[in-house]
């Protein structure tokens, strides 16, 4: 939906049609047995016909050039978490904290200024710092393609979101999810006051 809307101006009264058409595409892509088109018409209270949904589906696919797979923050996060865990002992707390930070970033419009890989690497750096671990390494630079200096602004933005989450009443679902023992209660962890400048210039 987001990719289509970033390319095409859509009137408000067509948003629901775009939404169900994108759900249809996603279900065909992800599910073994995709729901019938009539089911998508039904959830719109039959506001749209089968033909309208199919026409809109074609428009979305044509606009995206049938390119449906785009790397996300999570795609890179998995790779960088493995790279970090290959060097120093890390438990699930690290993985869950990095994932929680990534979810906070997904909900903040200001983070659209950064590439998904940039955000993922910054989430790893901040999570390592918050857990008192070495923040970066040659291995992480190799697998991420970023140096600490290149991550500074994005990492500070990630840290600010983590800090803000301690007092903000927004995003209760993410905080509740990661406050569960299943996720090591990472959303309840204390947040450091700031990210010191020296971690972005370790050679200095």
Which residues does each predicted region cover?
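Acidic, serine/threonine-rich low-complexity regulatory regions at protein termini
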Residues: 1-20, 24-204
